[in-house]
UniProtKB/Swiss-Prot annotation:
This is Adhesion G-protein coupled receptor F3. Residues 1-25 form the signal peptide. Disulfide bonds join C715-C747, C734-C749. One of its GO terms (molecular function) is G protein-coupled receptor activity. The chain crosses the membrane at residues 776-796, 812-832, 852-874, 882-902, 929-949, 974-994, 1003-1023. PANTHER family: ADHESION G-PROTEIN COUPLED RECEPTOR F3, IG-LIKE DOMAIN-CONTAINING PROTEIN. SUPFAM superfamilies: Family A G protein-coupled receptor-like (SSF81321), Hormone receptor domain (SSF111418). Glycans are attached at N188, N264, N301, N382, N441, N648. Keywords: Disulfide bond, G-protein coupled receptor, Glycoprotein, Membrane, Receptor, Signal, Transducer, Transmembrane, Transmembrane helix.
């Protein structure tokens, strides 16, 4: 410190006082003949801060003048320290003060309590102000200061028992007083709150040095006395450390045991070489706990970033106390930077080479020992916070060698860092020397060459030499040193080092400059990571940003969005495809953290537009906002959606942020209902957030207009929880509303987040005619299936007189049951709440999948029975063996397929189609239904081909009896008609999954799919000759119908007679007849 004046000392004396106090002191003339200065007869003195209340009341009174010999050059009276006096009259002379070449001025006295009697003690303050010509006097005075002989005389003179220096003040060239307390003394806490501390070397003494602007700075107080043997102050606490040497990954534990009541407890860490400590607060690595008489600090996952001096600062007994412990943390292998990691070299072209290992600065002293060291020269140097050890190998080794850099520190095991050297031999495949951008030496095939980063950058540049001797691409991890330091600072802030309220604005102030200087993918990724950690700190600490801090964020965001896509973003996304999602999440979090007093706030940049408003409890109408973008963007939040948020007089802030170009930087991840298609975007992302107090709300109805659109719009939002936290577009809670009068795309969403609109040129048409056609077709199918059940009710015993007929009709009856249940479930599914979170919707989709599959598996069972009878003509089938197999095939197989599909696709969010209770056609779930169906149709086609060949053989008539042969012909006829129909239906179903298909296949598929029950009734039931004969004999009483159409007209009479027949007790087929088909 540069001083423009000589130092100044304050002197305290200590005397015991016995006897009755008096109100006036004597005024003798000094030996020099100088009388006391006039004007010092009375002076008002404040209480001694830090003592008990009774003492403060006692001394806050005027006091009488005291005769003090004065030097002609001093006339200022600073406050002093305390003393114990023996008599009521105190006179100090220059001889009693140990007269020297210094001038002095002293004053004594407080009006003692008149109630004190003889033998009582009172505390009296005596102050001495000494000026010295230079700095050599205070140390000399401290060594020679002794009690004067005159003070040992008997009463009435006082008995002076102590004389000690308390405060040393120095004045700089600006006239400021730097006053530091000497050993055993300290400024009171109330004074510390009003004056700034010195930037001095008083590291471990809290409130030990203050800066004053006036020449009467006050005085330092005597700390509470401790042990009479040590004469040290009594510290009201003990700090315990589990170990001063913490290994990497350990957990540090500091415990403070307090003997007095303490307040304002804080923990600090001073890094090696740092002038000021860092506040420690709860974070990802720091935890702070306190209980009665005890406080604890815990730091997990220790590393060299946590080495240094830990301090516990608190207030007790009117003073500030600092207790500290020094913690050492050894380095680990990942903390050491090696250059190179490996090296392949040709001794013919490079007789020597250089190796280095660099370590960060730490409070441990490290030395390096290289091995092998023959023919080499070791050295070291320091640069920008790191220490590097270099080995210059002057002779190339004859064979492959592994060099080791052994880092050693006293009391620690050596840390070995290996560097492998490969010698290129004659005949080895090598990559040639390349000096296009960086210098790449000759490298052996299969090895990685390394080069240092340019100046002011950290990292390394790598390049692989391929097995064929061709250089691969250059991979650089070079990152700007200042940006890397900012990232480390932000990460440590989240861990618990520093005050977020102070650190976050400072970090945000540096982001625009760092964004402007980012020149590599590593710079971009480090910048995005820094913004991510800042956002996490703001969210966890719930701090608010002022306008300047938010502007810095938006400026940095604008520069990041404006970075070159080809040279920076594409390469950065190749390493981390979710880099754009990281930026979006950080900006979302920070943009809504503006202080309420800074509203309203608007800010506009080429790629960033923000508007934030504050609303009181009684806002008049809907919230609406518009942005002058191309196309224009508008948003509206209805008043009824905001009303529940402003209860109890709460103010709400609504922040709307528009980001350009960001949607092109987000990964092409599409959630449920969007599939893997590529969508076009209008280039805008809208972020809306609502804050009520310190709470953020994510639910609320918002209506957005994204302007003119081409194609079919999909209203989406960016869901950060999709794809293992990497984010993706989702349609959940959003729906598109295309206005008929204008081509604009309107979106209605039930939550608040980052919105956009995706344009698909080819989408499934959402026409009312298709929905109506589906409902009508399913109704007709259900009605036809009920008619089919009624027919079997009437003619079951007639048509199952042989085993072939029994197997065929049992399979057909189970097909009817399954298809009837599936169609009913599918028809009722639209009335359920769609989405994977709806149990009823999930159940409906699972049942439809299972029942539709079961329908086709029973058709397969029917075809397999036919194939067996055609191949093994004289082999008879037993009911008790065939029926269980048919049941297993018809129900167990489709149940297994449906269960596997549910377990496989539901966790991935690709089970249900968006907005429907049916399988997703884009994610792959629908293929687990269409695939088995087409496979069964293919098997049925093979069986039919085999049956046609058998029918053409004349020997077929020599096989089974005529009745069985007729039954086989019925099976063949049904399969011959139903298989092509079902095959065509689901072939068209696959075609509808294509993006560029027209609307015609959708209509044909809907008609054929919904009328499956009608086809089964006509071609599986009514075309059977046995059934026709049974129905004619029972109801028609006429000639047999010549066609299916006439049979249908006949069946209309059947329906009218059904109630009459049932009343006559016509039996329904028993469970023995149907086997287990009813289940």
């Amino acid at each position: 410190m540069v001083c423009s004046a000589a130092p100044l000392l304050l002197l305290a004396t200590t005397l015991p006082l016995l006897g009755s106090p008096v109100a006036q002191a004597s005024q003798p003339v000094s030996e020099t003949g100088v009388r006391p200065r006039e004007g010092l007869q009375r002076r008002q003195w404040g209480p001694l801060i830090g003592r008990d209340k009774a003492w403060n009341e006692r001394i806050d009174r005027p006091f009488p003048a005291c005769p003090i010999p004065l030097s002609s050059s001093f006339g200022r009276w600073p406050k002093g320290q305390t003393m114990w006096a023996q008599t009521s009259t105190l006179t100090l002379t220059e001889e009693e003060l140990g007269q020297s070449q210094a001038g002095g001025e002293s004053g004594s006295g407080q009006l003692l309590d008149q109630e004190n009697g003889a033998g009582e003690s009172a505390l009296v303050s005596v102050y001495v102000h000494l000026d010295f010509p230079d700095k050599t006097w205070p140390p000399e005075l401290s060594r020679t200061l002794t009690l004067p002989a005159a003070s040992a005389s008997s009463s009435p003179r006082p008995l002076l028992t102590g004389l000690r220096l308390t405060t040393e003040c120095n004045v700089n060239h600006k006239g400021n007083f730097y006053c530091a307390c000497l050993s055993g003394y300290q400024w009171n806490t109330s004074i510390c709150l009003h004056y700034p501390p010195c930037q001095s070397l008083h590291n471990h003494q809290p409130c030990g040095c203050l800066v004053f602007s006036h020449p009467e700075p006050g005085y330092c107080q005597l700390l509470p006395p401790g042990s009479p043997v040590t004469c040290l102050p009594a510290v009201p606490g003990i700090l315990n450390l589990n170990s001063q040497l913490q290994m990497p990954g350990d957990t540090l534990s500091l415990t403070l045991h307090l003997s007095q009541e303490a307040t304002n407890l804080s923990w600090f860490l001073r890094h090696p070489g740092s002038p000021s400590p860092i506040l420690l607060q709860p974070g990802t690595q720091v935890s702070v706990t306190s209980s009665h008489g005890q406080a604890a600090l815990s730091v997990s996952n220790m590393s060299h970033h946590w080495a240094g001096e830990y301090m516990s600062c608190f207030e007790a007994q009117g003073f500030k106390w600092n207790l500290y412990e020094v913690v050492r943390v050894p380095l680990k292998a990942t903390d050491v930077a090696r250059l190179p990691y490996q090296l392949s070299i040709s001794c013919a072209t490079s007789p020597g080479f250089q190796l280095s290992c660099c370590i960060p600065s730490t409070n441990l002293a490290y030395t390096a020992a290289w091995s092998p060291g023959e023919g080499s020269k070791a050295s070291s140097f320091n640069e920008s916070g790191s220490q590097c050890f270099v080995l210059a190998v002057q002779r190339c080794p004859m064979a492959d060698t592994t060099y080791a850099c052994d880092l050693q520190s006293l009391g620690l095991a050596p840390l070995r860092v290996p560097i492998s050297i490969t010698i290129i031999q004659d005949g080895d495949i090598t990559c040639p020397e390349d000096a296009s951008v960086l210098t790449w030496n000759v490298t052996k095939a299969g090895h990685v060459a390394q080069a240092p980063c340019p100046e002011s950058k950290r990292g390394i540049v790598r390049r692989l030499c391929g097995a064929d001797g061709v250089w691969g691409p250059v991979h650089s991890s070079c990152t700007d040193a200042r940006l890397l330091a900012l990232f480390t600072r932000t990460k440590l802030l989240q861990a618990g080092q520093g005050s977020p309220a102070e650190e976050v604005p400072q970090i945000l102030a540096q982001l625009p400059g760092q964004a402007a200087e980012a020149s590599s993918p590593s710079d971009l990724l480090t910048l995005l990571s820094t913004m991510k950690y800042v956002a996490k700190v703001v969210a966890e600490a719930r701090i608010q940003l002022d306008r300047r801090a938010l502007k810095n964020l938006l400026i940095a965001t604008d520069k990041v969005l404006d970075m070159d896509t080809r040279s920076l973003w594409t390469l950065a996304q190749a390493r981390k495809p979710w880099a754009g999602s990281t930026l979006l999440l950080a900006v979302e979090t920070l943009a809504c953290s503006l202080c309420p007093q800074d509203h309203p706030f608007a800010f506009s940049l080429p790629n960033v537009l923000l508007q934030s408003q504050l609303f009181g409890p009684t806002f008049p109408a809907d919230y609406s906002i518009s942005f002058p973008t191309r196309p224009p963007l508008q948003a509206q939040i209805p008043r009824h959606s905001l009303a529940p948020l402003v209860r109890n007089g709460t103010e709400i802030s609504i922040t709307s942020l528009v980001l350009r170009k960001l949607d092109h930087l987000l990964p092409s991840n599409y959630g449920q209902g969007l599939g893997d298609s590529l969508y076009a975007t209008p280039g805008l992302v809208l972020v809306i957030s609502i804050m009520a107090g310190d709470r953020a709300f994510s639910q609320g109805e918002v209506i957005m207009d994204f302007g003119n659109t081409d194609g079919s719009p999909h209203c989406v939002f960016w869901d950060h929880s999709l794809f293992q936290g990497r984010g993706g577009w989702s349609k959940e809670g959003c729906q598109a509303q295309v206005a008929s009068a204008s081509p604009t795309a309107q979106c209605l969403c039930q939550h608040l987040t980052a919105f956009s609109v995706l344009m698909s040129p080819h989408t499934v048409p959402e026409e009312p005619a298709l929905a109506l056609l589906t409902q009508v077709g399913l109704g007709a199918s259900i009605l036809a299936l009920l008619v089919c059940l009624g027919v079997y009710w009437l003619v079951w015993r007639v048509v199952v007189r042989n085993k072939i007929s029994y197997f065929r009709h049992a399979a057909l009856l189970n097909m009817v049951f399954c298809l009837l249940a599936a169609d009913t479930c599918f028809l009722g599914a639209p009335f359920l709440s769609p989405g994977p979170r709806s149990p009823l919707c999930l159940a409906a989709a699972f049942l439809c999948h299972f029942l539709y599959l079961a329908t086709f598996f029973w058709m397969l069972a029917q075809a397999l029975v036919l194939a067996h009878q055609l191949l093994f003509v004289f082999h008879q089938l037993a009911k008790h063996r065939v029926l269980p197999l048919m049941v297993l095939l018809g129900y167990l197989c489709p149940l297994g397929l449906a269960g596997v599909t549910l377990g496989l696709y539901l966790p991935q969010g690709q089970y249900l189609r968006e907005g429907e209770c049916w399988l997703d056609g884009k994610g792959g779930a629908l293929y687990t239904f269409v695939g088995p169906v087409l496979a069964i149709i293919g098997v049925n086609g093979l069986v039919l081909a085999m049956a046609m060949l058998k029918l053409l053989r004349p020997s077929l008539s020599e096989g089974p009896p005529a009745e069985k042969r007729q039954a086989l012909l019925g099976v063949i006829k049904a399969l011959l008609i139903l298989t092509p129909i079902f095959g065509l239906t689901w072939g068209l179903g696959l075609a509808t999954l294509l993006e560029e298909v027209s609307t015609v296949p959708h209509y044909i598929f809907t008609i054929l799919n919904t009328l499956q029950g009608v086809f089964i009734l006509l071609f599986g039931c009514l075309m059977d000759r046995k059934i026709q004969e049974a129905l004619r004999k029972r109801f028609c009483r006429a000639q047999a119908p010549s066609s299916t159409i006439s049979l249908v007209s006949c069946c209309l009479q059947i329906l009218s007679c059904a109630s009459k027949s049932m009343s006559e007790g016509i039996p329904w087929p028993s469970s023995e007849d149907m086997g287990t088909a009813r289940s």
